[in-house]
Amino acid sequence: MATASTAATFRPSSVSASSELTHLRSPSKLPKFTPLPSARSRSSSSFSVSCTIAKDPAVVMADSEKIKAAGSDPTMWQRPDSFGRFGKFGGKYVPETLMHALSELETAFYSLATDEDFQRELAEILKDYVGRESPLYFAERLTEHYRRENGEGPLIYLKREDLNHTGAHKINNAVAQALLAKRLGKKRIIAETGAGQHGVATATVCARFGLQCIIYMGAQDMERQALNVFRMRLLGAEVRGVHSGTATLKDATSEAIRDWVTNVETTHYILGSVAGPHPYPMMVRDFHAVIGKETRKQAMEKWGGKPDVLVACVGGGSNAMGLFHEFVDDTEVRMIGVEAAGFGLDSGKHAATLTKGDVGVLHGAMSYLLQDDDGQIIEPHSISAGLDYPGVGPEHSFLKDVGRAEYFSVTDEEALEAFKRVSRLEGIIPALETSHALAHLEKLCPTLPDGARVVLNFSGRGDKDVQTAIKYLEV
């Protein structure tokens, strides 16, 4: 049963400062904000900053290196600092128009930590409307599939987020942000979507709470996910196709931000991933942290311990961070994120941001990005619309750099094979996003000791992807 304590965890931090919305590659132009000597001892209301221009973030020793040099545990720095940064990643690179809205959002977010009515309402909705808690399911036949000839092998468990209302993890964040928007008095909701699951979740909660809903979706993704487009419209949402750029998730996000800048007084932006400007990466993570909290509780009930390995797909990274966050300080628990390698890492047609990207700024935050030598965004590719994004959440970038999490990639072909394999072994059709994580088991399981317990976040169901799979699979 979901409780207020498992529904969300809030960690106070002060407002971050910066002022660029568009993508930046030239580090010499990035402002570096430094607290005045006594700032950390002051209240947030009296917080001050001084501003200098950094020559290059690469010249400034990364926070992870400082921590290691000092002999400290780098995971203790995993929470964002007073500027919304995870090490050198994150921050708030937005136009002045949005600064007040983001500060207002952050203040409201923290106030919910002590708001018993909000926590109670959220817990009840997660339980009775979303259907939490989601099961931690022992995948018996998948486990048998990975047994070696000597009978040894890992034990595979699936965290069944596909059983949530709307069929994916996205509803956790959408319902919490909708409640938050009501507290802010915002009647108009906008969101971006790639695979359509976040769009469906947002349209669902807007119908539930009587809010106006506008969804931005790339025209290419609308073709790939026609079923979800119909579902959103059936729920009363206006779906606006985005034809600019690559007509995928990146461009949908850009259009949503433009809308927000124009209508900031009346509109709340339900960003769907742990990306974007502070406080979104922290806020979305905390609303999804219920996944990891339940996993810890369920693991203790099932075998009296923790998982040995956590596995999740990574596009923007919300489902992975929802699972990982609870276990970040448990350094004996491996955390593995799986990106989309598309046609292959050397093909130039992939979405493996953490594997092949460089540091830059996109959609309001500094993180790893797919970009060329001139700092222009490279068009990503994945058969999965939900992983087809050229950036990643800043906390994932931080966890990669400090070595706390591992990140690998899986091709379209490998994901399709896993889509078919798991459907036939377990009778569960996975989303193509989830199929990337499932595909990595082929490489991971042979390396694990006998009896190692692997928890894979089954982030969504595959009904939406059947039309795509028909084009490539023989069944």
UniProtKB/Swiss-Prot annotation:
It is found in: Plastid, Chloroplast. GO terms for molecular function: tryptophan synthase activity. Its EC number is 4.2.1.20. The modification N-acetylthreonine is found at residue 52. InterPro entries: Trp_synth_b_CS, Trp_synth_beta, Trp_synth_beta/beta-like, TrpB-like_PALP, TrpB-like_PALP_sf. It comes from the Eukaryota. It catalyses: (1S,2R)-1-C-(indol-3-yl)glycerol 3-phosphate + L-serine = D-glyceraldehyde 3-phosphate + L-tryptophan + H2O. It comes from Arabidopsis thaliana. Pathway: Amino-acid biosynthesis; L-tryptophan biosynthesis; L-tryptophan from chorismate: step 5/5. Belongs to the TrpB family. It is an enzyme of class 4 (lyase). The modification N6-(pyridoxal phosphate)lysine is found at residue 170. The beta subunit is responsible for the synthesis of L-tryptophan from indole and L-serine. GO terms for cellular component: chloroplast envelope; chloroplast stroma. This is Tryptophan synthase beta chain 2, chloroplastic. It holds the Pfam family PALP. Residues 1-21 have a biased composition (Polar residues). Keywords: Acetylation, Amino-acid biosynthesis, Aromatic amino acid biosynthesis, Chloroplast, Lyase, Plastid, Pyridoxal phosphate, Transit peptide, Tryptophan biosynthesis. One of its GO terms (biological process) is L-tryptophan biosynthetic process. Its cofactor is pyridoxal 5'-phosphate. Tetramer of two alpha and two beta chains. Residues 1-51 form a transit peptide.
